[in-house]
UniProtKB/Swiss-Prot annotation:
It is found in: Nucleus. Belongs to the activator 1 small subunits family. ATP binds at residues 74-81. This is Replication factor C subunit 2. GO terms for cellular component: Ctf18 RFC-like complex; DNA replication factor C complex; nucleus. The modification N-acetylmethionine is found at residue 1. Residues 18-30 have a biased composition (Low complexity). Residues 1-30 are annotated as: Disordered. Residues 1-12 have a biased composition (Gly residues). Subunit of the RFC complex, an heteropentameric complex consisting of a large subunit RFC1 and four small subunits RFC2, RFC3, RFC4 and RFC5; the RFC complex interacts with PCNA. Forms an heterotetrameric complex with RFC3, RFC4 and RFC5; this complex has ATPase activity but is not stimulated by PCNA. The heterotetramer of subunits RFC2, RFC3, RFC4 and RFC5 interacts with RAD17. RFC2 also interacts with PRKAR1A; the complex may be involved in cell survival. Interacts with DDX11. GO terms for biological process: DNA repair; DNA-templated DNA replication; positive regulation of DNA-directed DNA polymerase activity.
Length: 352
């Protein structure tokens, strides 16, 4: 895949001036370097990583040319906006710049935007290939106010002959039912570790980045299925240290180290509450939030080698504690109580 502008046809500067991968320490470069997230953003639908079934439906839309209004829902960093831009590029070709309006609904979320910007664009005359429509892209559409969404549904009907709407959102249930019923809803899931690894290796090869296997594992661990996060972490670590290993990655990402968390779980499996608590107290005094600690405990526990029945019991207790923390009971005592319950699960029941 070539290094190209990902600005998606909105005429961003620096479209083709992405510099080749730096062979020296990156901080010394005297020119502007595009973020790798933008530099390696796919420009065609077949370059998108993951969610093959959903992307294949978009390819059918691009081939047939008859696109419905669409909603793409899914977690951050899975390629929702990129997919819409690739679809628009495939449909409109050279007319992309004039025939696409891209709005981020997090900023442009009020009813005035629907009444002014969107309506004005929908009314504009644009010369397009036969059977093609103008496209209005609403990113993070679940941030739009209810009033704006109500106004949007009427606009979608009035201009249905000339304009198609493409909405990207994290939670489709925050889009009102009348809009959902006017759209084809496509769902994206988090990317697998192997999918992220394949793209990381591709970028590493192009940028001539030195790395270790444990460094890539650390990037994948911190990304949690988010390709944007993975590429940002890769570039940040390379910019800061010039070498990708797990120590450098966790210095940049700064979250509870999974090796420490793994050791803590091992002490719980051995019913050694004192040693487990020492590690917990250490993480706490390093300033990590309870949400960060409990999140990493869960992620490490999922892949930890232990009896299946015990893993299920551990995950149940971790989930229960996570719920309490989310409700605001996030003290060190709450976390210590979790360790005590985990240790208790591993101890043989005492005959009465």
């Amino acid at each position: 895949m070539e290094a190209q502008d990902s600005g998606g046809g909105t005429g961003e500067c620096g479209a083709q001036d992405a510099a080749p991968g730096p062979s020296k320490a990156p901080g010394s470069a005297g020119h502007y370097e595009l973020p790798w997230v933008e530099k390696y953003r796919p420009v065609k639908l077949n370059e998108i990583v993951g969610n093959e079934d959903t992307v294949s439906r978009l390819e059918v839309f691009a081939r047939e040319g008859n696109v419905p209004n669409i909603i793409i829902a899914g977690p951050p960093g899975t390629g929702k906006t990129t997919s819409i831009l690739c679809l628009a590029r495939a449909l409109l070709g050279p007319a992309l710049k004039d025939a696409v309006l891209e709005l981020n609904a997090s900023n442009d979320r009020g009813i005035d935007v629907v009444r002014n910007k969107i309506k004005m664009f929908a009314q504009q005359k644009v010369t397009l290939p036969k059977g093609r429509h103008k496209i209005i892209i609403l990113d993070e559409a679940d941030s739009m106010t209810d009033g704006a969404q109500q106004a949007l549904r009427r606009t979608m009907e009035i201009y249905s002959k000339t304009t198609r709407f493409a909405l990207a959102c994290n939670a489709s249930d925050k889009i009102i039912e009348p809009i959902q019923s006017r759209c084809a809803v496509l769902r994206y899931t988090k990317l697998t570790d192997m999918q992220i690894l394949a793209r990381l290796l591709s970028v590493i090869e192009k940028e001539k980045v030195q790395y270790t296997d444990d460094g890539l594992e650390a990037i994948i661990f911190t990304a949690q299925g988010d390709m944007r996060q993975a590429l940002n972490n890769l570039q940040s670590t390379y910019s800061g240290f010039g070498f990708i290993n797990s120590e450098n990655v966790f210095k940049v990402c700064d979250e509870p180290h999974p090796l420490l968390v793994k050791e803590m779980i091992q002490h719980c499996v051995s019913a050694d509450i004192d040693e487990a608590y020492k590690i917990l107290a250490h993480l706490w005094h390093l300033g990590y939030s309870p949400e960060d600690i409990i999140g990493n405990i869960f992620r490490v526990c999922k892949t930890f080698q232990m009896a299946e029945y015990l893993k299920l019991e551990f995950i149940k207790e971790i989930g229960y504690t996570h719920m309490k923390i989310a409700e605001g009971v996030n003290s060190l005592l709450q976390m210590a109580g979790l360790l005590a319950r985990l240790c208790q699960k591993t101890m043989a029941p005492v005959a009465s």
